[in-house]
Amino acid sequence: MKQKIIQKIKQQIEAGIYPGASFAYYQDGVWSDWYLGEANPEIGEQTREDLVYDLASVSKVVGVGTVLTFLWKEGKIELDNSIRDYLPEVDYPDITLQQLLTHGTDLDPFIPNRDQLSEDQLKDAMFHLNRREKRAFLYSDVHFLLLGFLLENYFEKDLDQILQEQVLDPWGMKETQFGPVSRAVPTVRGQKAGVVHDPKARLLEKHAGSAGLFSTVHDLKIFLEHYLQDDFAEGLSQNFSDLSDKERSLAWNLEGDWLDHTGYTGTFIMWNRQKQEAAIFLSNRTYEKDERAQWILDRNQVMDLIREAD
């Protein structure tokens, strides 16, 4: 079945879906790696081990999602508490941590003139968002931006320092950090490599809970092994949403026993604690074009093959 997955990735590279990909699969206690296609077509650089990628929204689980799960498991926060208990500046006394972690609020993520706002103005705008007619699943970066600000209030530190102390240092993830970074796979042709692709995260830099982390296959292997083995992750393979329209774990998408998170730049990670399997897919699919709807279909083909693998 692994060969079917690799064949599909090769087909997608040949079809121009993305120039190259780094892929790793964990099964029977062993990681297998594949490095396919080109990392930087402009200079003919081949995909290889140790490349640094813009994780985009995979940052949500590597950072904020993991720290909040730690706090919850340690009894330091309650999921049904209001966000205002930890972040008094917000307008949302009725919105809980559980709703934010499962993207189940009624917040309207639209921010007028977003690209003209300063960092402080953008942060303030997220404290006073409009509301939709009713609660429903809506995947949005604002949920994890708010949770990042919550953590900064809770720890009285910048988010980058929190992630360093709570996750990256204890787990030995030395190749993971907020951008901009000096060395990375370029996400868009002609643009400087190492600059954060996501506009809000680019502006908020070390305060962004939604995106902005760069990492490697090596570090994500460490990360996923902790989710497969550590006590804190036990019990996450269940639905935490109180809505009927989408099952979600805390921070993670949930499909059966598989938990996953995807990123806009062409990234995803997956893990299955019951089967003790995991997968890492890193690409720069935004390099030549940005066809998001088609990318979701193509990405899902690879993810479905992983879920079906023996």
Language model: regions and residue ranges:
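Short, surface-exposed loop or secondary-structure junction motifs
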Residues: 33, 93-262
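Short, gly/Ser/Thr-rich active-site loops of penicillin-recognizing serine hydrolases
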Residues: 245, 289-310
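Active-site SXXK
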Residues: 6-10, 23, 29, 51-79, ...
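A short, well-structured edge-of-sheet supersecondary motif
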Residues: 9-46, 102-105, 114-115, 252, ...
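Active-site-proximal loop and beta-strand segments within enzyme catalytic domains
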Residues: 18, 33, 38-141
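Glycine-rich phosphate/pyrophosphate-binding beta-alpha loops
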Residues: 206-212, 259-271, 280-289
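Short, positively charged
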Residues: 1-7, 39-42, 122, 247-254, ...
